[in-house]
């Protein structure tokens, strides 16, 4: 159905549908096809439109009505201006503001406002109205036209004064709305450039004659054919009441809308399941239809949809709409759609409804049941308790507020609404069985008491808390392996006699897959709290110490009762923090049960001790800042080091005595001999992190080590046996941490040499200073930007092989013979792969082998005459192998340097 057809049959028109038969339609068609009939018809139209004929027609009508005792006056409206609006937001409407001398003049009088006392003018503006008539707009669509006629003086005043013009417009709109029961859109008024809409048609004013004769008052035989006579008071005009309050003109119009509930046919709702009809009354979607007749498109329209509302705004001039609509159900605003029908100018919005799950429905029914039971106002004293006691308990319980924590960020609560006030008695449901968590931990840090409840698979939406001043009640549910929920309850309460000033400020609950973490934030520090009360409810509370892990199984209850912690004697826990030694000393001592007053005095003493310790810490910090530049050991540390030296000297003496024995096992190795020579009772000194040489590397003990972890590029490197032996030595309590005083350095400080305060001082000085020396030589490695490191390494390896082969070809027979004699003279068989170039690096160390042995022997002798090297041939062999390996490494590094120089030259 088109818009014109729908408006034609609207109730606004008041016209009945044209009922014409087929026979009548054929007769009209045949008559119009006759030329003579058409000519007569056009003559009739011209006769009606002729002004002279119209005057004659009005004169005859006036004479006829006078014979009936009715005075008739014709009003001919003169053009003024036009106001365009709409009726009920459906149909266009034009109001012609016209003028006629027949209408009385507007008059005014001075009046006083009764509320403000101000003087002003009270206007009386007469007007005449014509019945609405149908017409067509510029688009040939049907519209309504109303005529409101004023005196010409009123229009003249309106042209000169804008306020009076607005008063004329408001008076015309009020008259049309009250006379014809329509609703005009005052927010979207338009003023087209027209003087008059349509053809001007005269209207008639009828009133009874004042001097009517008896014949005129008699009923006419054709009375039923004439218009109805006016009433006796028809000559009195209708007076519209003056508006006492100025109603502001609305800036936006509210469009007409409708909300439809859309429901699909679901065959699952017709089954015999218990939850089949839970969602029957809830629609699948909401369809919102908004009528926007002044909009041809939604380009200038803004639409915002939320879960519970729809907001529409149009700021287009002449089509200002604003609508804020609350929806009856929660909808999914992300999945909705909107469509604008340009033919009917209707906006259709489809929004799917968010349906609650079966679990939420059951929780909702439980909430209604609980609220109905608690708000019924009827209480039965079945236990014989007095009403006064119940009122006192109710006042205490009124302070408890349930805090619902939703970890899924949903608006639907589980068991209680957020604003419900719940007492501790009604916090746990009577129809459920609650268990205490099997194991939980408790710890305190500053003002936070943390509980870890070891319960897996906790449902986050089942966590509920009841917070009071000195207690907290927690309940939650865990889903087991058989998908059956297990309900838990945990009540923690502070003892009444301990720390009465402590109160719970706020809480934090975190439910994870493996446990539940409960944090209580107190109003002040609670580190001195010795114990707390815990249980499933207030009737089954037990006292637990603060620090520890507790199991609540039945098998462990007997062991807990026999434990000293569960005895009646309380425990005294003292913690001392030493900043100098970076240690925390914890002492736990049982003490006899004392009175609450004695415990309070004990807590005060502990607080005083803590304050004294804090003051002492501040003094120690200041002293450390003053002595920051002096890096020295204390006297006690030096005494311990001296004692360690004496003990090591005794160990070396015992080792020498055992080595002088004639009988030694054949398979005895130096490591086994050292293990045998170790004394049974070792020196009990505090174990420290240390780096030390292996005891088998005695020949290199005379060389001072640096503090760098990386070895020098050209210096000797320890072999695999050295590193292995050093790892074995670390297992001892004080392995090789102190050397003889005459060796010039101490290995307990990482091989850094120490300066002596005096030449004659044999022992360690009180201030053992550490010195660091650096080498001025800078080693560098150059890499090309356009090549990778691995590729360059392979390239250098090829160059190195070519260089070695070239050196072998250039060597004379005499040089190669000398190298062979050197190898055979040392009693070693030269390997097949060793070249002459390699031999020049082995020649010097092997020839000086005997001299190095004598030198090492002299250096290894202590000032007291003790030989610390054990004079083993095995050590000499190991030394020779290490020297060969170091020489090879040195040769390889020198070749790398040569290659780098060649690359730079290239």
Curated annotation (Swiss-Prot):
It holds the Pfam family PIH1. It comes from the Eukaryota. Keywords: Cytoplasm, Phosphoprotein. Signal peptide: none annotated. Residues 614-691, 793-906 are annotated as: Disordered. Residues 618-631, 793-808 have a biased composition (Basic residues). GO terms for molecular function: protein phosphatase 1 binding. GO terms for biological process: axonemal dynein complex assembly; cilium-dependent cell motility. The modification Phosphoserine is found at residues 376, 812. Residues 837-850 have a biased composition (Polar residues). InterPro entries: Kintoun (IPR034727), PIH1/Kintoun_subfamily (IPR050734), PIH1_N (IPR012981), PIH1D1/2/3_CS-like (IPR041442). Required for cytoplasmic pre-assembly of axonemal dyneins, thereby playing a central role in motility in cilia and flagella. Involved in pre-assembly of dynein arm complexes in the cytoplasm before intraflagellar transport loads them for the ciliary compartment. Belongs to the PIH1 family. Kintoun subfamily. HAMAP family: Kintoun (MF_03069). Interacts with Pp1alpha-96A, Pp1-87B, Pp1-13C and flw. This is Protein kintoun. It comes from Drosophila virilis.
């Amino acid at each position: 159905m088109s818009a014109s057809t729908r408006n034609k049959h609207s109730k606004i028109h008041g016209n009945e549908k044209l009922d014409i038969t087929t026979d009548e339609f054929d007769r009209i068609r045949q008559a119009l096809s006759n030329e003579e009939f058409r000519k007569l018809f056009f003559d009739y139209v011209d006769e009606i439109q002729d002004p002279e004929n119209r005057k004659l027609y009005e004169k005859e009508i006036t004479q006829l009505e006078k014979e009936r005792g009715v005075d008739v006056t014709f009003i001919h409206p003169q053009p003024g201006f036009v106001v365009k609006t709409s009726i009920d937001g459906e149909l266009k409407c034009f109001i012609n503001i016209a003028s006629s001398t027949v209408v009385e003049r507007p008059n005014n009088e001075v009046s006083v406002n009764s509320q403000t006392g101000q003087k002003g003018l009270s206007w009386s503006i007469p007007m005449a109205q014509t019945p609405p008539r149908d017409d067509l707009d510029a688009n040939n669509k049907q519209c309504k036209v109303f005529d409101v006629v004023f005196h010409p003086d009123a229009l003249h005043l309106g042209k000169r004064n804008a306020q009076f013009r607005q008063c004329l417009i408001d008076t015309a709109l009020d008259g049309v709305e009250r006379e014809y029961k329509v609703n005009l859109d005052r927010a979207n008024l338009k003023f087209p450039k027209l003087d008059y809409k349509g053809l001007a048609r005269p209207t008639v004013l009828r009133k009874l004659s004042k001097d009517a004769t008896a014949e005129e008052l008699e009923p006419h035989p054709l009375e039923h054919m004439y218009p109805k006579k006016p009433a006796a008071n028809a000559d009195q005009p209708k007076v519209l009441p003056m508006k006492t309050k100025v109603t502001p003109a609305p800036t936006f119009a509210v469009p007409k809308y409708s909300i439809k509930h859309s429901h699909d046919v679901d065959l699952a709702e017709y089954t015999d399941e218990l939850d089949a009809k839970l969602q029957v009354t809830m629609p699948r979607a909401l369809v919102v239809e908004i009528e926007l007749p002044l909009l041809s498109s939604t380009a200038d329209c803004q639409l915002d949809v939320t879960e519970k509302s729809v907001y529409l705004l149009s700021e287009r001039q002449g089509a200002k709409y604003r609508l804020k609509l609350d929806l009856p159900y929660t909808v999914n605003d992300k999945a909705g759609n909107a469509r604008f029908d340009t033919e009917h100018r209707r906006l259709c919005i489809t929004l799917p409804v968010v349906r609650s799950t079966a679990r939420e429905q059951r929780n909702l029914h439980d909430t209604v049941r609980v609220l109905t039971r608690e708000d019924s106002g009827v209480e039965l004293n079945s236990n014989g308790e007095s009403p006064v006691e119940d009122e006192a308990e109710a006042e205490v319980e009124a302070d408890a507020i349930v805090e619902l924590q939703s970890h899924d960020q949903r608006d639907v609560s589980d068991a209680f609404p957020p604003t419900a006030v719940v007492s501790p008695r009604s916090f746990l449901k009577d129809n459920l069985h609650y268990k205490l968590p099997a194991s939980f931990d408790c710890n305190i840090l500053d003002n936070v008491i943390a509980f870890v409840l070891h319960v897996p698979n906790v449902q986050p939406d089942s966590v509920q808390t009841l917070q009071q001043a000195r207690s907290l009640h927690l309940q939650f549910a865990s889903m087991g392996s058989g998908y059956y929920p297990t309900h838990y309850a945990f009540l923690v309460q502070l003892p009444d006699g301990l720390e009465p000033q402590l109160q719970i400020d706020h809480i934090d609950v975190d439910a994870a897959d493996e446990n539940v973490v409960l944090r209580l934030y107190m109003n002040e520090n609670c580190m001195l709290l010795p114990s707390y009360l815990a249980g499933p409810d207030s009737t089954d509370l037990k006292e637990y110490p603060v620090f520890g892990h507790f199991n609540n199984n039945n098998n462990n209850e007997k062991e807990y009762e026999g434990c000293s912690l569960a005895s009646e004697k309380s425990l005294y826990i003292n913690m001392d923090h030493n900043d100098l030694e970076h240690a925390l000393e914890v002492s736990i001592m049982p003490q006899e049960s004392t009175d609450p007053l004695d415990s309070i005095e004990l807590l005060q003493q502990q607080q005083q001790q803590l304050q004294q310790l804090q003051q002492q810490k501040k003094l120690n910090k200041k002293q450390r800042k003053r002595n920051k530049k002096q890096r020295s050991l204390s006297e006690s540390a030096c005494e311990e080091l001296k004692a360690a030296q004496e003990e090591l000297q005794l160990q070396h003496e015992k080792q020498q005595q055992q080595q002088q024995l004639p009988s030694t096992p054949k398979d005895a190795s130096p490591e086994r001999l050292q293990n045998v020579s170790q004394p049974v009772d070792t020196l009990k000194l505090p174990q420290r992190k240390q780096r030390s040489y292996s005891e088998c590397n005695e020949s290199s003990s005379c060389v001072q080590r640096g503090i760098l972890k990386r070895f020098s590029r050209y210096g000797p490197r320890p072999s695999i046996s050295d590193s292995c032996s050093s790892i074995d030595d670390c297992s001892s309590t004080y392995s090789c941490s102190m050397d003889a005083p005459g060796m010039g350095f101490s290995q307990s400080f990482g091989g850094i040499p120490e300066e002596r305060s005096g030449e004659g001082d044999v022992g360690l000085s009180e201030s053992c200073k550490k010195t660091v020396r650096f080498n001025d030589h800078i080693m560098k490695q150059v890499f090309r930007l356009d090549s990778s490191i691995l590729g360059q390494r392979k390239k250098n390896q090829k160059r190195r092989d070519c260089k070695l082969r070239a050196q072998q070809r250039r060597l004379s027979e005499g040089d190669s013979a000398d190298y062979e004699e050197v190898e055979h003279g040392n009693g070693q068989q030269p390997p097949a792969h060793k070249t002459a170039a390699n031999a020049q690096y082995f020649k010097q160390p092997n020839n000086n082998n005997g001299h190095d042995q004598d030198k090492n022997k002299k250096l290894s002798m202590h000032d007291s005459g003790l030989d610390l090297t054990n004079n083993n041939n095995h050590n000499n062999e190991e030394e020779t192998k290490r020297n060969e390996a170091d020489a090879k490494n040195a040769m390889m590094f020198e070749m790398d340097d040569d290659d780098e120089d060649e690359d730079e030259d290239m």
